[in-house]
């Protein structure tokens, strides 16, 4: 009897020890992911998770510097147009080898109009990609081929020095052809979804959490310290903060703007604020009235927005007012600043009132407009402030409409908007990552800009190999975008996170990328 009791106690202690040994990282995510298909993902809620589950030809280190990914090395032809990627041994989380053919399959999906990727423009430097995406060529004419299972050959239209930077975006990730052909659209269901990254899907509870577990088949598995990552949906920033303070989260995706002062005073060592390549803006729907062919109205609304007051009193976290679209800090590029950026408040208001009248509106005949934003406390406060500024200065009647992430994205895609809150986070360190967003017909061009002159400038920049000349062309494009008031830049983002002291291995970076595979949990026992 005594031996049985001792054996039972030992087993219980072993079980308890095993449970304690599991290393779990609990992080919040802004919203429920709209899609876990790499070729269909559009926003940060998807990208954070996909970055944990997949890896492309190129990867990033903890500081978001480019490093080899599935491609352990690559060669570039003398003319800069042919890139040959040599793949390392890698496997899907079900153990099936990842091959060059998986990349060919994925990239063809990305530009196939029948698939409908909104990020197909990332592959436009590849031969025939744009023509295919526009429905004018067969997908098998795309300039990508598998010389063998370990060798991928990519043909570009022009030399593209920033091409490796494009390859960290999810749209370029490989996808498992053997699973997609078997499961069809259901391939992203938790029981079917596999990736080639550090973690694999274990559970997906909609509007609650996504649980990932370490993948033994990832080529760098020996360096991954976490056993499990849990992403919690956290659109309510105050609730997110409460969960963090209660010890239910190790890392927050954001913090409430109105709590910054308190957080600095009480959790200063755990509050991490850092500049990154991101722009908060309001987009006009340029496909229909009242903003189509009405630059005076667009300019009037832009002039009224008091960016300095917004970043001082509402966001209050060190954001910079934005008058151009490209963020400061992009290598080799000086962002464009319009003339009115140097005007005082009074001069801007006088000009805005004159333009508003010329556009046919007045306080007696006010503009009535809908402003769409995705559900988020911080977004709501900025939207309320902008609506009040428009009302006070011009008499504009604004209806605020908030929607959950997936519905919000759909309204933007379908141009079911008048004005909408937008944001763009740079995907690589080049001005092109901001400006090619608005090329005519582009999948992420949700303002509906159709400007041949703008498109021409982007095409010229793509062909220009001299860095200084190329930057000058891109600045002309940004100038055209801003001077035509096709959108309203408001501020440049900072990343804002609360991080528990025992979370190690991450590095502040301008991309705001935090792959879980570099994270360590170092709690005192």
Regions found by a protein language model. Give the residues of each.
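Alpha-helical secondary-structure segments
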Residues: 100-106, 149-155, 159, 197-198, ...
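Surface-exposed binding/hinge segments that line
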Residues: 102-104, 111, 115-178
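Aromatic- and charge-enriched surface segment that lines or borders ligand/interaction sites
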Residues: 72-119, 153, 243, 291
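Structural transition elements
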Residues: 321-358, 376-381
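Extracytoplasmic/peripheral linker and loop segments enriched in polar/acidic and small residues
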Residues: 311, 345-346, 396-413, 433-501, ...
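N-terminal lobe/hinge region of extracytoplasmic solute-binding protein
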Residues: 28-78, 192-195
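Gly/Pro-rich hinge or "lid" segments in bacterial periplasmic/extracellular proteins
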Residues: 135, 150, 158-224, 228, ...
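Extracellular/periplasmic solute-recognition and catalytic clefts
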Residues: 202-213, 230-288, 312
């Amino acid at each position: 009897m005594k031996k049985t009791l001792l054996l039972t106690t030992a087993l219980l202690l072993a079980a308890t020890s095993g449970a304690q040994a599991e290393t779990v990282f609990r992080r919040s995510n802004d919203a429920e992911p709209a899609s876990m298909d790499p070729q269909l993902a559009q926003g940060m809620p998807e990208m954070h998770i996909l970055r944990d589950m997949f890896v492309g030809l190129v990867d990033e280190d903890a500081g978001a510097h480019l490093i080899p990914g599935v491609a352990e090395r690559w060669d570039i032809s003398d003319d800069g147009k042919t890139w040959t990627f040599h793949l390392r041994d890698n496997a899907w989380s079900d153990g099936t080898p990842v091959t060059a053919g998986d990349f060919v399959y994925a990239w063809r999906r990305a530009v196939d109009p029948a698939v409908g990727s909104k990020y197909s423009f990332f592959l436009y430097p590849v031969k025939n990609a744009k023509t295919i995406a526009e429905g004018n060529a067969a997908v098998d004419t795309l300039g990508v081929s598998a010389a063998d299972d370990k060798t991928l050959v990519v043909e570009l239209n022009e030399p593209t020095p920033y091409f490796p930077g494009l390859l960290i975006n999810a749209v370029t990730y490989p996808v498992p052809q053997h699973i997609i052909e078997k499961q069809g659209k259901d391939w992203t269901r938790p029981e079917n979804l596999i990736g080639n990254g550090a973690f694999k899907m274990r559970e997906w509870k909609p509007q609650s959490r996504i649980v990932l577990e370490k993948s033994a088949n990832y080529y760098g598995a020996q360096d991954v310290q976490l056993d499990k990552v849990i992403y919690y949906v956290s659109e309510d920033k105050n609730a997110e903060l409460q969960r963090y303070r209660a010890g239910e989260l190790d890392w927050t995706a954001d913090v409430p703007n109105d709590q910054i002062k308190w957080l600095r005073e009480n959790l200063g060592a755990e509050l991490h604020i850092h500049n990154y390549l991101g722009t908060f803006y309001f987009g006009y729907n340029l496909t229909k009235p009242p903003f189509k062919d009405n630059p005076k109205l667009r300019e009037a609304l832009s002039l009224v927005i008091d960016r300095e007051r917004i970043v001082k009193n509402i966001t209050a976290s060190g954001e910079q007012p934005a008058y151009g679209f490209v963020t400061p800090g992009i290598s080799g590029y000086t962002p464009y600043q319009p003339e009115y950026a140097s005007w005082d408040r009074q001069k801007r208001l006088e000009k805005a009132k004159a333009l508003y009248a010329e556009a046919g509106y007045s306080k007696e005949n006010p503009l009535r407009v809908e402003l769409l934003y995705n559900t988020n406390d911080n977004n709501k406060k900025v939207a309320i402030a902008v609506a009040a500024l428009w009302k006070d200065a011009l008499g504009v009647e604004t209806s605020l409409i908030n929607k959950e992430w997936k519905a919000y994205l759909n309204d933007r895609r379908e141009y079911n908007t008048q004005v909408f809150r937008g944001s763009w986070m740079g995907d690589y360190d080049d001005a092109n990552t901001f400006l090619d967003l608005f090329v005519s017909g582009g999948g992420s061009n949700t303002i509906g800009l159709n400007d041949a002159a703008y498109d021409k400038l982007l095409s010229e920049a793509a062909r220009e190999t001299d860095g200084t000349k190329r930057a000058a062309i891109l600045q002309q494009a940004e100038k055209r975008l801003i001077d035509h008031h096709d959108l309203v830049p408001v501020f440049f983002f900072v990343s804002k996170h609360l991080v528990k002291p025992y979370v190690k291995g991450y590095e502040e970076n301008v991309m705001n990328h935090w792959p879980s595979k570099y994270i360590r949990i170092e709690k005192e026992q």
